[in-house]
Amino acid sequence: MREFGKSRKLDNVLYDVRGPVVDEAARMEENGTNVLKLNIGNPAPFGFRTPDEVIYDMSRQLTDCEGYSNSKGLFSARKAIMQYAQLKKLPNVTVEDIYTGNGVSELINLSMSALLDNGDEVLVPAPDYPLWTACVTLAGGTAVHYICDEQSEWYPDIEDIKKKITDKTKAIVIINPNNPTGALYPREVLQQIVDVAREHELMIVSDEIYDRLVMDDYEHVSIASLAPDLFCVTFSGLSKSHMIAGYRIGWMVLSGNKALGKDYIEGLNMLSNMRLCSNVPAQSIVQTALGGYQSVGEYIVPGGRIYEQREYVYKALNDIPGISAVKPKAAFYIFPKIDTARFNITNDEQFALDLLREKKILIIHGGGFNWDKPDHFRVVYLPRTEILKDATGKLADFLASYKQK
């Protein structure tokens, strides 16, 4: 009988945030082992709750959400997103430039599928959120990784970006605030990226899902606000800021010189129509979520959970011999560096597996974020401080005698 294998289009597609190490953790859990999951930015399991007003409004509107919406989304949702984009100073945005999706993830896939021909190149940061590289690859393109510099607060290396541009380069992706590093890019760095994009006629694609999770009174600047003459695509959503990752509601905003993307927009509309619409109940709460009280603000100031957990994990990790980390300014991730010579580490995935098996702690190795050296890993600091204290204590104990074989 004929056997059925996976498509060859998936041969070079990786997504290790839910990959082999996570699969091993699942097997351990099936056998009754309690695993502490520091691998994925899912707020709900760690006690973060959706604002009551949002839940109430959804429940009141459920009977009105039984049919399809416009393929781009409900007018009320898109109007609220448009107004939010205007507050962020995105230029030349109308309701028709807004696309809702089942989370930003769906829209990343849609946006790359509409853009890329086989062999086209997209500049993607390293480290990155791996879905970007996966979706570029799946669409037939090539993700060309530019370095973000740990010695410079994990900001993009502008000279490296310039070196990576070829006549096949179509777009540059930035992730700001950044996952996995927690970096926040200042206006000056963003302006340099805009200048490069302008010189080389690149589309700017910006993932800004963590833009409302910025700490220490820093300002988040949308790169599209600096590029009215370029064609920009900006992504955000409610999964992180409103702690509703399971509701699956994100959006994509087109801005700037949209005449440059006229044919591309036709492709976006075609793909948007093909999936009919994003889930309507989640769309129904966008207006309330964006227009109402922003409870996330309580988490990211001194005394707030995310702020205090960041403070703890940053110090605790840096106190472990052989570990160093740059302090995150946003989101809820930290990307520590490990002294590979000290621990004889040549395979970071094996390091993550060894930690999982010995200490029952699940982290994602740096290679899962397209970082090409075996010297980093990502920690999610959503668990309460007492849990993080237990986790960092176990990590310190593990490393006290660890030598990779």
Feature roles, as predicted:
Residues 31, 139, 199-200, 230, ...:
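Helix C-cap/helix->beta junction micro-motif
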Residues 144, 149-220:
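Active-site phosphate-binding strand-loop segment of PLP-dependent enzymes
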Residues 87, 163, 344-346, 354-363, ...:
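PLP-dependent enzyme catalytic core of the Aspartate aminotransferase-like
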Residues 2-6, 11-103, 110, 277, ...:
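N-terminal small-domain helix-loop-helix segment of the aminotransferase-like
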Residues 287, 303-314, 325-339:
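Conserved glycine-rich beta-strand-loop-beta hairpin in the small C-terminal domain of fold type I
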Residues 225-304, 314-316, 399-400:
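Conserved core segment of the aminotransferase class I/II
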Residues 114-136:
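Conserved PLP-anchoring active-site segment centered on the Schiff-base-forming lysine
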Residues 137-144:
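A short helix-loop-beta submotif of the ANL/AMP-binding
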